[in-house]
Amino acid sequence: MKPTLYTATGECVTPGRELGKGGEGAVYDINEFVDSVAKIYHTPPPALKQDKLAFMAATADAQLLNYVAWPQATLHGGRGGKVIGFMMPKVSGKEPIHMIYSPAHRRQSYPHCAWDFLLYVARNIASSFATVHEHGHVVGDVNQNSFMVGRDSKVVLIDSDSFQINANGTLHLCEVGVSHFTPPELQTLPSFVGFERTANHDNFGLALLIFHVLFGGRHPYSGVPLISDAGNALETDIAHFRYAYASDNQRRGLKPPPRSIPLSMLPGDVEAMFQQAFTESGVATARPTAKAWVAALDLLRQQLKKCTVSAMHVYPGHLTDCPWCALDNQGVIYFIDLGEEVITTSGDFVLAKVWAMVMASVAPPALQLPLPDHFQPTGRPLPLGLLRREYIILIEIALSALSLLLCGLQAEPRYIILVPVLAAIWIIGSLTSKVYKAEIQQRREAFNRAKMDYDHLVSQIQQLGGLEGFIAKRAMLEKMKDEILGLPEEEKRALAALHDTARERQKQKFLEGFFIDAASIPGVGPARKAALRSFGIETAADVTRRGVKQVKGFGDHLTQAVIDWKASCERRFVFRPNEAVTPAERQAVMAKMAAKRHRLESALTVGATELQRFRLHAPARTMPLMEPLRQAAEKLAQAQADLSRC
């Protein structure tokens, strides 16, 4: 039986079941207060820490307790004794935040959560920081393990006893930190002992957490190196402001990993906030505050729209195309559509009727385009003193004749007087030939450029309103029709393939349960694990030799260590033939085919209407390009005339 403890006001507190233990202390249920828990230190903290906890407990309010596991009361071994722990709200029904932002974890634990849910989580993270900052305090040790999130998107900050607390002017410092969440300007500090943190330091960690949540757990300073000394260590890249997604990332030396979510998915003002947070300007003029993030993310939440193909594809309204569909097509799945809410095609779609519209569409007449032949410009004369080509040929013939004549000089010495004449003719001919060649080269290049510009405009106009564009669009629609007709057979083949690939799929799903973050791999610590995660390597299922080696810092030795870890996971796999094909897998195939049918039928319906109107709208589409084409034709005619003068 655990001893009874006392609050500062003398209330009895009896610790119950142990919920967890760390290096500093252990957390217990409290028999008397079911909604609170007790953190008991292994050894009584120093007097300053006791004062800090007493101040925190005395200043707890509803706002803090809503977002933070904040001390509610100090705990003592006896009435009036030393502080040996504290009471705080019980955090239940919540998991570490990486379970949400990690695509692999989320697919298993939160399969129904789409990007709008993640956006709300990011907003609530910012709100938790804003609450701490409004009370004059600083989180200090920002890291992913300090944030718990529930299925309602509510975020709670834990480990509040490590915060930097301003107790009416007395600062209780936060003297710990995680390197890959430490801002660039603090990376060179040997330790945080005696160092005062600021809200702007917190704002770096806040922006990093928001980036993690919105961009699938990627680290903003992890990417593909563009210079030799980049990518060796995450801490070094942070210190040098090597923000891989920056607008000027070529100069910084890192670019985003392959197949990552593009930053352009966000509106420009939110992009700019990340740029401010992760580059030098955030140190000089301050990073976006927690309040600014709350406002920006709340506004973004009001501008979302859903993809017509998948109910799980939610994205910002300024985009014309679904970014998740684009990533799906690259083989990168961030959100699983379980097939329960796929938008189906309306029942009035009849392929024969739509195709009849296509076949009834009338092609546009031949376009009357400005031609170079319509212009008769005068070619520019050659520069003064430059001989035409035929005169240069005559000089070359004369030079050849005089060369033959000189062969007889030994026999006829009196012809020696012709040598200076021959030399003069040779010099004049040589110089004239070089200048002529430069001039003709210049005119030929001008002609080629003019022809390229003219041909490009002709092609544009033909595609917009000519027969070529009409035929190309009809061919594209015919391909869609053929795809629709082939869908039943495609679905049949896909369902049959489930049996052929059953073993590999079971093995893949098995390996997806082994997370690198939780693994003990020699030489692969938290920073290297963050780098792997930025390249989409989260579980044993993601590991390939080629994939690991593309991450800077993973040479043969470390790569082999990761491969060996994967092999150790694979050895535990046992195939279950009785579960070769599950109903959920069959449903997923049929849902995928239904989504494809909807996409094709919608596109064909719209395309058929556009083709019917192609002839009608052709003049309006081509008219803006007619004057530029006339000018291009005139320019080409002039270039042709100039070239003919050579």
Swiss-Prot record:
UniProt keywords, alphabetically: ATP-binding, Kinase, Nucleotide-binding, Phosphoprotein, Transferase
GO MF annotation terms: ATP binding; protein kinase activity
Residue numbers annotated as active site: D141
Ligand binding (ATP): L19, G20, K21, G22, G23, E24, G25, A26, V27, K39
InterPro entries recorded: Kinase-like_dom_sf, Prot_kinase_dom, YegI-like
Domain Protein kinase: start-end pairs: 13-300
UniProt modification remark: Autophosphorylated.
Annotated transmembrane regions: none
Broad class of enzyme this protein falls into: transferase
Coiled coil: none
EC numbers on record: 2.7.-.-
Superkingdom field: Bacteria
Protein's job: Probable serine/threonine kinase.
Protein name, UniProt field: Protein kinase YegI
Gene encoding the protein: yegI
